[in-house]
Amino acid sequence: MEKQTVAVLGPGSWGTALSQVLNDNGHEVRIWGNLPEQINEINTHHTNKHYFKDVVLDENIIAYTDLAETLKNVDAILFVVPTKVTRLVAQQVAQTLDHKVIIMHASKGLEPDSHKRLSTILEEEIPEHLRSDIVVVSGPSHAEETIVRDLTLITAASKDLQTAQYVQELFSNHYFRLYTNTDVIGVETAGALKNIIAVGAGALHGLGFGDNAKAAIIARGLAEITRLGVALGASPLTYSGLSGVGDLIVTGTSIHSRNWRAGDALGRGESLADIEANMGMVIEGISTTRAAYELAQELGVYMPITQAIYQVIYHGTNIKDAIYDIMNNEFKAENEWS
C-alpha cells in the first residue's frame, strides 16, 4: 500500500496505540485532541504519560488541536473518542472536511440516550459525498500491549468488503493483523456490550468469587450479548469470532481492562463516583449498561446479567443480592433463546 495520511481523532490510550501501528506501517499520522498540554507533550516529548508512562512515540507522529489542519488532504479518518462525544465530533468533522475520505471508528459503546451504534451516528452526521461506508475496527486489544508491539489480532467490519480490505491493509503488519467482516451490527454490538460483562466479571473478582463464577459470567454474558445482537440484525456467528468471544475474554479477565477494574472496585465496595474520579479514564461499560438495558426492555430480549448490573449501578442494589437473584432465576435450558 502507498503511504496514506490518517487523522486519528482522540489521543487516548487506544488512539495513541493505533497511531503507532499506522506510523510503523509508514503512514503519515496526525493525532487530534482538545487538551493543549497533552498535544504539546506528544509533539515536544513524544510521550503520552497519562496513559503510557514508559513509552516514547516516534517523532513523526504529530498532534494538533486545530481540526482543519488535522484533516487537510487526509486519506482516512479514525474516530477514537468517547461514545458520548462521537456525534459532536462527527458534526465538527462534517463542517470542516472538504473532500471524500475513508471513515473508521475504534470506539466501543452505544450512544447513551438514543441507544444507537456509533457507525449509525457517523452515517447520520457525515454526508455521503464526504465519506465511504463506515469501517468498525474492533476486537481483543489492550492498548497497553499493542503500544509495545505485542501480537494483536482484530476485525475490520464494513458493509462494503473493499473498504474493509483497505483498512485491513492499512493497519496489518508483523505484530498487528486484521480480519475482514461485513457484519457491522454484530462486530459493533459485540464490542460495546462486552464492556458490561467485564464490569460484572470484575465485580465477581472484587467480591472474592473464584474462576468458576468468572467463567460462568463470560459464557452466559456471551449468550445474552448474542441475543440482543441478533434481535438488532446481527449474525450469531460473529459472536464466536475475534470481536465477540475474543474481545469478551480479554476484557472480562484482565487487569488492563478499565471496565474490569471498575467492576472490581465496585465489588470491593467503592462508590461509582470515586471509581470514575480515581481512574481518570472513560468507563464505557457504565453508560453502555443503561443503553443496553433500555434497548433490551424495548425489544423484549432476556438479559439477566445486564439487568443485574444496571440495578447495581443505577439503583444502588447490593451486588451480592443481584448475584443471588440471578442464581434464583427460573430454571432454563442452556441454549434457550429467551
UniProtKB/Swiss-Prot annotation:
Sites where the protein binds sn-glycerol 3-phosphate: K108, G139, S141, K194, D247, S257, R258, N259
Subcellular location: Cytoplasm
UniProt-annotated catalytic positions: K194 (proton acceptor)
GO molecular function, one term: glycerol-3-phosphate dehydrogenase [NAD(P)+] activity
NADP keyword on record: yes
Swiss-Prot/TrEMBL keywords: Cytoplasm, Lipid biosynthesis, Lipid metabolism, NAD, NADP, Nucleotide-binding, Oxidoreductase, Phospholipid biosynthesis, Phospholipid metabolism
Catalytic activity from the UniProt record: sn-glycerol 3-phosphate + NAD(+) = dihydroxyacetone phosphate + NADH + H(+); sn-glycerol 3-phosphate + NADP(+) = dihydroxyacetone phosphate + NADPH + H(+)
One annotated GO biological process: glycerol-3-phosphate catabolic process
Family per record: Belongs to the NAD-dependent glycerol-3-phosphate dehydrogenase family.
Protein name: Glycerol-3-phosphate dehydrogenase [NAD(P)+]
